[in-house]
A protein has these predicted regions:
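NTP/phosphate- and nucleic-acid-binding module
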Residues: 2-198, 207
């Protein structure tokens, strides 16, 4: 993302974007203490400020997003090599200028690695077995509700489907009637399900 600013105000906006982007990362729910800023001591020739937001992976702190004040390098070079005037008339100051750029850059691959490394858990069970559980924060869970009829008879699948119909416009809902209910709960644990509904418990609540 490139944010265009008035020359001379780029440091104010760079600081504002640092705070905004750090707040976004912390809102994911993995713990505020797992993030830090790493300001660059050596800057690229076009930059006058740069920092990375780093996340504490199992293998140490690594960058997940960069925030840079790129001065007028980008638009200035477009203007220079295109031969066309690229300036903004500022109605507040009555001046025309080449805007400075504050840029934030985040990669989907690193974010995916961050989410999976934080959420992936292997629980040890009795007998030496283990099971995979994905402990995603609620905001990131892809499925919010699973509806699981206890048996495939006595009208339970129909009741379960009514529950799905009531919820599907407000939540990401899955319906599962395959295998035992315990195995179905287990499958939902593996993808970080937030809520389940047993149709047997809800038959008295649904007409």
């Amino acid at each position: 993302m490139q944010f265009f600013v008035r020359p001379g105000e780029e440091m104010k906006w760079w600081q504002a974007w640092k705070e905004t982007r750090m707040a976004w990362h912390r809102a994911l729910g993995f713990g505020d203490d797992r993030y830090r800023f790493h300001d660059h001591e050596k800057l690229a020739h076009y930059a006058n400020a740069a920092t990375d937001i780093e996340y504490n992976f199992p293998f140490g702190f690594k960058e997940v997003e960069g925030i840079h004040s790129r001065t007028d390098f980008d638009l200035g070079n477009h203007q220079k090599f295109s031969g066309r005037k690229i300036q903004y008339f500022d109605p507040e100051t009555g001046e025309s200028y080449v805007p400075y750029v504050v840029e934030t850059s985040i990669g989907v691959d690193r974010m995916f690695l961050q989410v999976m490394s934080a959420a992936y858990t292997e629980e040890q069970l009795e007998g030496g077995d283990s099971r995979v559980v994905l402990r995603l924060p609620a905001a990131l869970a892809p499925v919010k509700v699973a509806v699981l009829p206890l048996v495939k008879k006595d009208g339970m699948p129909e009741v379960a489907q009514k529950i799905v119909d009531l919820l599907k416009y407000d939540y990401n809902v899955v319906y599962d009637e395959k295998d035992s209910v315990g195995k179905r709960y287990r499958r939902q644990d593996a993808v970080c399900l937030l809520y389940t509904s047993d149709a047997a418990d809800d038959m008295q609540c649904v007409d």
